[in-house]
């Protein structure tokens, strides 16, 4: 094929996965093209106007630690900030922010259009071209007829592949409301042998702020001081804004009348009327799903969230539905404060195609086709944050392939929630839209929101995602934390009638850094360093115990499975285990150990076989 132009990496889709993939690829020095149907909708928030939440907020900080953009964007455009789970331990706390979705979109449009090595192309990719051997990417073809040669393609199409919107008994093709779906690219996947599955998600109506009676509703303000997401937002090296003007949300509830309206019209919903075949998200159900599944509950919480700082659009979090539009008006008006509400846009459900993520390596490259990467909703996940986490990993690996680097970029389960998510996706697959929770991790005490930068800065620096100045700053911060902890271990004070180290004294539940300061004991100036010291001191024993449990997994993750292994030649493996390993192609013994049905005995047999393969290669 004769190509019109050449890029090292092509990213398809300008959502939250595509943005991080494209920016990461460009940052690593590859000539990158971001191809999207509408370049003014890069970074659009089609559902909730927020970033972060339980586990999700930790992922945003991990993306930031890896050199990504989402955290910086929300810090600049957020209108309310808070930390969730503050009554619980630090392992499960997460930041969350309400976004001005228009300002967020503008920020990302500007960023992608003004990044070195990155070109934004307004077009639709309708086909992916393979080399003659049929298992490696060679280029893409667009709807406008542009033929682009490339070494790697990252597909981040969100809900656009064969997207179908449902509003009651009405349905029509769309990728998002008022945007056309991608119907030609799925044909490539069918030809290439990928099986496509149908998933479903939904979004509530948008409400006119001027028609809501806020005076009778419960106000939900942000935190003071407000938490920020990026380690690099001023004041640099802190996770707290000095000042940030915030806008409140409001809380209301469904009523028995709401539930009656929904129950009487269940047959008119796309979900219960049988029109939807796709599988929906368990942890973000439609309101009709909640009414059916939690029949004994007399009310459900609704959060009224502003979509912009100065606009009139309100997002009623908790009220997504596929009811017909006329019934939606009745339902929304049965809720306190919304008696006279006007709907700006109706709620809708959307079905779309995904590829099972077990088709991928932990690099997010497909096993079938070299140079083809998937990220975001297309992998069966839900949420902007999960998409961004996958996007940055896919973008980094696509760039490394384009640059001819042999060592892939892989994040382990013990290193980050991004690693937990990707490992879950690639080893277990999905039976419903995947959402990240802290409970999915075995290493919650280590994978906290406060230490994301400390966990990942070395990996980011090693591949070029952090510069020298950034690396030096984090390194010095880490050294200062260690130095203060050592000082506290070596300095003794009187506690009643006995002498104890400051370290031991700080482990007492009633003692914090502020108490030490009041006692005249020196403490670091940085609020971030104070927080890190206190967490590390108070959880010292638990962290040590978790680290010991982690050692075995690290050992198994360190043993790579040769690409040319023939599982049928491994002594002692049952036939079904041979079939599973051959199908999933795990990259390490650690990944193999997490596949369903793989026994400890099978791992031992694999270890012995791999050692024999190594010895054979040494002796020639």
UniProtKB/Swiss-Prot annotation:
The UniProt family comment states: Belongs to the MnmG family.
Q: Which residues bind FAD?
A: 13-18, 125, 182, 377
Q: Which GO terms describe its cellular component?
A: cytosol
Spell out the subcellular localization from the entry: Cytoplasm
SUPFAM superfamilies from the UniProt entry? FAD/NAD(P)-binding domain
Which cofactors does this gene product need?
FAD
Functionally, this protein is described as follows: NAD-binding protein involved in the addition of a carboxymethylaminomethyl (cmnm) group at the wobble position (U34) of certain tRNAs, forming tRNA-cmnm(5)s(2)U34.
Specify where it is mainly localized. cytoplasm
Keyword match tRNA processing: yes
Flavoprotein as a keyword? yes
GO MF term set:
flavin adenine dinucleotide binding
The alphabetized UniProt keywords are: Cytoplasm, FAD, Flavoprotein, NAD, tRNA processing
Annotated NCBIfam families: mnmG_gidA
> What name goes with this protein?
tRNA uridine 5-carboxymethylaminomethyl modification enzyme MnmG
Instruction: Please name the HAMAP family in this protein's record.
Output: MnmG_GidA
Subunit relationships = Homodimer. Heterotetramer of two MnmE and two MnmG subunits.
The residues listed in the UniProt record as binding NAD(+), with positions renumbered to this chain, are 280-294
Gene Ontology terms: biological process: tRNA methylation; tRNA wobble uridine modification
